[in-house]
């Protein structure tokens, strides 16, 4: 079995749904920007060496639909490089990396780019039209349990207090802020250039 190695990793900054700086950036453009920079960062790597592109996405519709991975490939790599989308909800990006590893282990690929992209500004959490299975809805509605209710059930089952959750969240954010201030993430976060055009009194104004 061939060994698989992660030789480089890169990501965009994290945005804020509906009102963050990346709210108007398409997820395919976001991923393409990162991939182009990633390929440049790896010494000796050329786009044509990539055997496959695997993209994780939890809601593959609208701006994230139409086999998005293929279009990301066309935007960032030679047209000969294929791509496909994998959906395992919140674990989609990680599953993409697992599949890349499996392809290399099996000998069906030598070089794979894998990760995930998502815009919760452009595509809502449950998509634009949920069409749930009637039999499941009637007989096993818990199969469609959302993450919020899942959290409530876990809190009850494992006796997790609200204060404990809030403290964990606070400490997590504090660690992230400290890491950013100490430039710990500088090598893995690639900045995204964003331009917004607004019209005020008939005059166009550009904000970058």
Residue positions per predicted region:
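N-terminal beta-alpha supersecondary unit
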Residues: 18-41, 49-62
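Flexible glycine-/small-residue-enriched beta->alpha junction loops
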Residues: 106-158
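Short, well-ordered amphipathic alpha-helical segments that serve as non-catalytic structural scaffolds
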Residues: 27-42, 68-72, 96, 147-154, ...
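Conserved catalytic cysteine-centered active-site region
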Residues: 57-110, 142-152
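Active-site-proximal alpha-helical scaffold in enzymes
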Residues: 69, 88-117, 155-185
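Condensing-enzyme catalytic core mediating Claisen C-C bond formation in acyl metabolism
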Residues: 1-27
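N-terminal extracellular/periplasmic Venus flytrap/periplasmic-binding protein-like
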Residues: 11-13, 24, 28-33, 44, ...
């Amino acid at each position: 079995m061939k060994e698989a190695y992660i030789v480089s990793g890169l990501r965009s900054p994290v945005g804020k749904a509906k009102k963050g700086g990346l709210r108007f950036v398409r997820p395919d453009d976001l991923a393409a920007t990162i991939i182009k920079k990633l390929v440049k960062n790896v010494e000796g790597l050329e786009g044509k060496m990539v055997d496959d592109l695997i993209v994780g996405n939890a809601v593959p519709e609208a701006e994230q639909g139409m086999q998005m991975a293929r279009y990301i490939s066309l935007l960032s790599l030679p047209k000969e490089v294929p791509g496909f989308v994998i959906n395992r909800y919140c674990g989609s990006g990680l599953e993409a990396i697992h599949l890349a590893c499996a392809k290399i282990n099996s000998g069906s690929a030598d070089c794979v780019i894998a990760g995930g992209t998502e815009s919760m500004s452009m595509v809502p959490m449950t998509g634009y039209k949920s069409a749930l299975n009637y039999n499941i809805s009637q007989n096993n509605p818990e199969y469609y349990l959302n993450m919020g209710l899942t959290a409530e059930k876990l809190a009850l089952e494992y006796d997790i207090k609200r204060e404990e959750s809030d403290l964990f969240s606070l400490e997590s954010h504090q660690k992230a802020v400290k890491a950013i201030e100490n430039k710990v993430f500088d090598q893995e976060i690639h900045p995204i250039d964003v331009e917004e055009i607004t019209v005020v009194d008939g005059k166009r104004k550009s904000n970058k």
